[in-house]
Each structure stands twice: as structure tokens, then as C-alpha cells.
Regions:
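Residue-level signal for well-ordered alpha-helical scaffold segments within enzymatic catalytic domains
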Residues: 3, 31, 103-106
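Active-site clefts of carbohydrate-active enzymes
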Residues: 1-20
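Short, glycine/acidic-rich beta->alpha junctions
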Residues: 20-26, 132
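Active-site region of glycoside hydrolase catalytic domains
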Residues: 29-41
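Carbohydrate-interacting/catalytic domains
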Residues: 39-42, 46-200
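Long, well-ordered alpha-helical scaffolding segments within enzyme catalytic domains
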Residues: 24-31, 99-100
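Residue-level detector of alpha-helix boundaries and kinks
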Residues: 17, 30, 86-90
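Conserved catalytic core of Hanks-type protein kinase domains
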Residues: 7, 35, 107
Length: 200
């Protein structure tokens, strides 16, 4: 099954009718792209923060991008740059968002735990958590052979520090040793830190 966040039927993430800010879609992008091995569709300018706020033809100004009318959208025109396809006309914010999309989608192809691995949901072990709000954060694990990914996303507008419970069943299911310390690499920032995995 195809995963997606935007299509011609849905209001754009960045539109005034939905989130109003394309950066608010990044946590959902990470979850949708990394949760399973399914393909991820990026829709016509989504990676640049297309707002879909033009008043175009059949549908009018509704936060969507028409597929029924002969139309072009601002972000794609900027990315095309009069046929150079170099993105030089994109704003700095659009370039930054594009870099995030490129990084996440590249990880989906490079990381075997995402493209071929098993999934373990951690949400059931983190309801009413001491330092985890199940309404604002989401977490799961992916594993393939010796590669383990611990994915945590924050849907809140504020940065947070979280503590995540890993149930003992996860260690059995994923065949990972308990009470070990690991060198963890943040795949979006390349920051390295030591973490300990203790069963809950």
C-alpha cells in the first residue's frame, strides 16, 4: 500500500486550511516514511512546502492543488528556475525543508532496517508516561540483522525531553540484548551519544 501525506484530494499541510506551516508535517513524514516498507509518495511541491492557496480553475482557493486545470504552482516554478532545475529560486526556508525531505527519503533507501526490517510499536508501553505524552510524541523501533533504529518524533510545537519505556517483549521479539549500552547516531543530525537499553 502507498503511504502519503498529501494528494490532489487533501488540503496541503502548509495551507491556511490545515497546518499553515510545512515544517509541522515533518514528524508525520518521518512516521509515514519509516514505519513500514511501503513506498512513500511526495506530492507535487510538498517537499518545498507548497501551500495550495492559489485560486485555480475548477476548485478555487481551497488549500488543494488542482489536477483538473492547466496550472502550475509557485514552488515548482521556483525549483525549475526557467528550465535549469537547480532550485536557486527557492527561498531559504524552502531549501531547508527540501533538504529534510531528501535526508528522510534517502534514509528510507539506505537503512536496511527501514527498507527490509521488522517493526515494533512502543506506544502501548508508553501510555500516561512520566516523560512521554502519547498525544504529542510517537515512537517505534525498526530492526534488520544487526541494525536497530529507535525512532522518536515530536508533534508538539515545543522541544521536549522524553523518557521511553521499552517493554521486555521488544528485546525478545527484536533479539537484542538487555542492559547493554550502545553508541547511537541521530540519523538526521549525525550527533553521536551513548544510550542504555533497559527493559521496562
Amino acid at each position: 500500500m502507498l503511504n502519503f501525506l498529501e494528494n490532489h484530494d487533501e488540503q496541503r499541510i502548509a495551507s491556511d486550511f490545515f497546518a499553515g506551516d510545512p515544517r509541522k508535517g515533518v514528524p508525520a513524514l518521518i512516521v509515514s516514511a519509516c514505519m513500514n516498507t511501503n513506498p512513500m509518495m511526495i506530492y507535487f511541491g510538498q517537499e518545498f512546502g507548497e501551500m495550495g492557496m492559489d485560486s485555480e480553475g475548477f476548485s478555487g482557493r481551497d488549500g488543494r492543488t488542482t489536477i483538473f486545470d492547466y496550472w502550475s504552482v509557485d514552488t515548482i516554478r521556483r525549483w525549475r528556475n526557467e528550465g535549469k532545475f537547480d532550485g536557486k529560486m527557492l527561498t531559504e526556508e524552502q531549501k531547508h525543508l527540501y533538504a529534510i525531505y531528501q535526508r528522510v527519503l534517502t534514509l528510507c533507501n539506505e537503512e536496511q532496517a527501514i527498507s527490509n526490517g521488522v517493526f515494533f510499536d512502543l506506544m502501548y508501553a508508553n501510555e500516561n508516561g512520566w516523560r512521554f505524552n502519547e498525544h504529542k510524541q510517537y515512537t517505534f523501533m525498526r530492526k534488520y540483522k544487526n541494525e536497530l533504529l529507535f525512532i522518536v518524533v515530536n508533534f508538539d510545537n515545543q522541544p521536549v525531553n522524553v523518557a521511553i519505556n521499552v517493554p521486555s517483549h521488544a528485546f525478545d521479539f527484536l533479539q537484542i540484548p538487555q542492559f547493554d549500552s550502545y553508541k547511537a547516531v541521530d540519523l538526521l543530525t549525525d550527533k553521536v551519544e551513548e544510550i542504555s537499553l533497559l527493559p521496562y
